[in-house]
Amino acid sequence: MNSEEFRKRGKEMVDYIANYLDTIENRRVTPDIEPGYLKHMVPLEAPQHPEDWDNIMQDVEDKIMPGVTHWQHPRFHAYFPSGNSYPSILGDMLSDGIGCIGFSWAASPACTELETIVLDWLGKMVGLPEDFLSYSENSKGGGVIQGSASECVLVSLLAARAHTIRQLKKQHPFVEEGVLLSKMMAYCSKEAHSCVEKAAMMAFVKLRILEPDENQCLRGSTLQQVMEEDRAMGLIPFYVETTLGTTSCCSFDNIAEIGPVCEEYGVWLHVDGAYGGNSFICPELRGPMKGVQYASSFNFNPNKFMLTNFDCSLMWVKDRFRLTQALVVDPLYLQHSYSEKSIDYRHWGIPLSRRFRALKLWFVIRSFGVQGLQNYIREHCRLAKRFESHVRKEPKFEVASPVHLGLVCFRLRGSNQLNQKLLSSINASGKLHMVPASLNDKYVIRFCVCRQTATDEDIDHAWNVITQFATNIQDIMAAELVERNEMEDTVENKEKAEKEAEENTEDVFRMLDEKNKKSLRYKRSFFVRMVSDPKIYNPKIVRSLPGAGTTRRHTTSDSSDECNLPVNSPTIDQDTLTQLLQQTNLKEVFSDIETKYKFITKTTSDLSGRLQACENLLNTKESERLK
């Protein structure tokens, strides 16, 4: 592609991007595909010869776009906003066109110096103390653009670790660094971003995760108590990460309380304002910043809430030398003669190579102005309040946490399963896209205002979709509850039938021989009794025994096994027994036994059939429920 074709294709690309954003609402917000879809549409081997540009762009529309989640879509309300604006896109285009790698001042002076100036602009815009600014008098601090908030957290943790080890080595010069490191402890809230845990893993430091209060806010008293306990066990607190605008519900840790605790213990305090920090350009929203003067480092992401495309995460430190001492590696081929008078940003982060990211941020601030950016943030806050009012007007819904900035956490009144089904059904439909969070063990749904040009109509439409699906889900859940109750009743009836079958088997002779139930009690199995004492099962034998007219209570080891037997029954010799048997109609006795046996067999067969029918019914219900 030569410059002439680039001019042509570049204009076409600008048109494609503009048309994409103008008509994005005509697309489904989330892709309706399965993992691995693209390998069946794109060759698994690279082409050996050049391909026509028109064919490439046709594949973008036919093969790539069906697998794209459209973060700029008016129906996208998941996560946090993905910053995007035309000035930012043009800034990235120019940065890519220049193609410099600004790892040092000498590598590209403008790349370095514009970054320093723009970071000072933004530090002043959000109200940071002058200690964090590069060009403030007597300041040792400064700002830098990192790739993400995760990088900011990792870099600050590494700086705090290195500084703490240096201080401890002065006190204990003969103790190995590994021993000192094993005693060092970092802290964060349970609501902190997962990148804090990952950073601790990468830095090989212990991390204690603390419980926030009922509003998901980490308090100073909680931190101080845990630190005192750890110090009593010989551990060394060295780093605390706090969040202003948590991912789950946009809560704010109380740095006004936490800051003095960190100062007392000589601990590095990092403040992560990835989302919430952007709002501090509005003076009326700076309340949570109270106490920021205690921080050692601070970050926020214009690529979330300031119309700047990813990647663009801003980090400030109060003492830049503590940061660079932890990361400096200075081979000869990277040194230059101006290093004493300039900033080399390669010492401020993990990567050596750095893009000219300050350009897009410079373009955005100049194109919108501070007031334009403030109005954008205030509008998102207003739209979130509009959605909150919808939730509060509907009795079957509840707001799950205080609403801050552009995020509303809500749920249906009911079980976690009900809310999970609601969100799953909405997302599966492609009509909206939201994500969940867990607050106080409750499953909640996060609704975030994300689109740059979001309107009242967008908010109202989203609420209508949610209420429609909520009604359907509640109807389905009610039907499932009825079905589940029926299944439970079936199981209960099955258990009852089994119990009755057992009782029927035990009491079968009592039902058959009503005329003898007053004189004979059948508590045990017929066959056991017949073997152990056959005479009591034939009233004629009992009546023929001497002394049958007078009875006494027969006592066995089982007090419940009682029957009326003759008093003073004499010992029966063989001749007497033979005579008694001759007087007894044995045919009648065995006929009686046969009748009772047939009844037992029939009863058992009937019960078996009933149990099988119950089991078949359960299997049918379970199959229908799974479908």
Q: Over which residues does each language-model region extend?
A:
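Glycine- and acidic
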Residues: 3, 98-106, 132-144, 180-183, ...
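Conserved PLP-enzyme active-site core in the AAT-like
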Residues: 139, 151-322
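PLP-dependent enzyme catalytic core of the Aspartate aminotransferase-like
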Residues: 439-627
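Conserved small-domain helix->loop->beta segment predominantly found in fold-type I
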Residues: 31-35, 340-379, 388-416, 431-441, ...
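C-terminal, well-structured subdomains that either form a transmembrane helix-short loop-helix hairpin
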Residues: 242-254, 260, 294-299, 369, ...
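N-terminal entrance/gating region of PLP-dependent enzymes' catalytic architecture
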Residues: 1-140, 345, 424-434, 442-443, ...
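Short, glycine-/Ser/Thr-/acidic-enriched flexible segments
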Residues: 191-193, 214-215, 245-247, 276, ...
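Active-site C-terminal subdomain of aminotransferase-like
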Residues: 265, 288-394, 402, 563
